[in-house]
Amino acid sequence: MIEPDRLISAVSGREREEQLDRAIRPLKLADYIGQPSVREQMELFIHAARGRQEALDHTLIFGPPGLGKTTLANIIAQEMGVSIKSTSGPVLERPGDLAALLTNLEAGDVLFVDEIHRLSPIVEEVLYPAMEDFQLDIMIGEGPAARSIKLDLPPFTLVGATTRAGMLTNPLRDRFGIVQRLEFYNVEDLATIVSRSAGILGLQIETQGAAEIAKRARGTPRIANRLLRRVRDFAEVRGQGDITRVIADKALNLLDVDERGFDHLDRRLLLTMIDKFDGGPVGIDNLAAALSEERHTIEDVLEPYLIQQGYIMRTPRGRVVTRHAYLHFGLNIPKRLGPGVTSDLFTSEDGN
């Protein structure tokens, strides 16, 4: 049996991590590092909306996990000087769930819906008139006596976030006046983020130490901040507390994060494709079965960075590894990958 004080300690530790996460999140666009185009555009749109004393247009933010979609939604509310209410697509199971949120919004408020691509069709139908006309259609009664009434809503801003913009229905996508895509971060911006977070956490970190963490963070701020906290643990226990390049390198090697930012699962994915499927092509379902992982884990968590870095390609016949994957593991490159992938990979069959 677990002792009560251990349970209390575990909760406190989790709360501390959540508090740290909130502390290192920027609250203003001026503090939002990276994504220069998105930052400049949002600054313009927000300034214009505030000048007209209007709610900001509905905004869709999409991109791989961990790039700052939730952070940007909170910044929008902060910059507009309004409140934000947060929920997610899977939570809104019934129209009444959405109606309860909408009717509690004040003028100009932000409603943030994470994983908006997972909204049920029946909830989407309620959302359309709310977004377009700021009206809520509610059915009262049942059977022949049922009737529809319209409730006026205050102007509000819906901010939707998704890792899969392609899964949004056209009617929903078309109702967003602002659409922003977040890209993977470069090492310089990530190093700046790591240094900023270290300062907030009261850590001493050298420029090279921040750069070492940034190099292995897969272009993702969330991962960079997570690695920073683990390197901090290593520095406090096995070092002098300061984070140098050497300390960061030793800590990340202990965490099994290599120089490209690949962890055990990334390497397992690439080696499975090379060893079991001769480098591909392999369908996503076969790959998921071979790895004993969920399909969406591969598509949403692993693949985006590996594709962006040129280690995997999607073809009509399935996924294939590139020559970079063989070079990464010090393996001989197959002849077919000499000048490039042979053209027969790009014909017939669907690789999904």
Swiss-Prot record:
Catalytically driven reaction(s): ATP + H2O = ADP + phosphate + H(+)
Binding site for DNA: 295, 314, 319
A GO CC annotation given for this chain: Holliday junction resolvase complex
Residues binding ATP: 24-25, 66, 69-71, 132-134, 175, 185, 222
InterPro entries referenced in this protein's UniProt entry, alphabetically: AAA+_ATPase, AAA_lid_4, DNA_helicase_Holl-junc_RuvB, P-loop_NTPase, RuvB-like_N, RuvB_C, WH-like_DNA-bd_sf, WH_DNA-bd_sf
Biological processes, Gene Ontology terms: DNA recombination; DNA repair
Disulfide bonds: none
Keywords: ATP-binding, Cytoplasm, DNA damage, DNA recombination, DNA repair, DNA-binding, Hydrolase, Nucleotide-binding
Role, per record: The RuvA-RuvB-RuvC complex processes Holliday junction (HJ) DNA during genetic recombination and DNA repair, while the RuvA-RuvB complex plays an important role in the rescue of blocked DNA replication forks via replication fork reversal (RFR). RuvA specifically binds to HJ cruciform DNA, conferring on it an open structure. The RuvB hexamer acts as an ATP-dependent pump, pulling dsDNA into and through the RuvAB complex. RuvB forms 2 homohexamers on either side of HJ DNA bound by 1 or 2 RuvA tetramers; 4 subunits per hexamer contact DNA at a time.
Similarity-based family: Belongs to the RuvB family.
Protein name: Holliday junction branch migration complex subunit RuvB
UniProt source species: Pseudomonas paraeruginosa (strain DSM 24068 / PA7) (Pseudomonas aeruginosa (strain PA7))
Top-level taxonomy: Bacteria, Pseudomonadati, Pseudomonadota, Gammaproteobacteria, Pseudomonadales
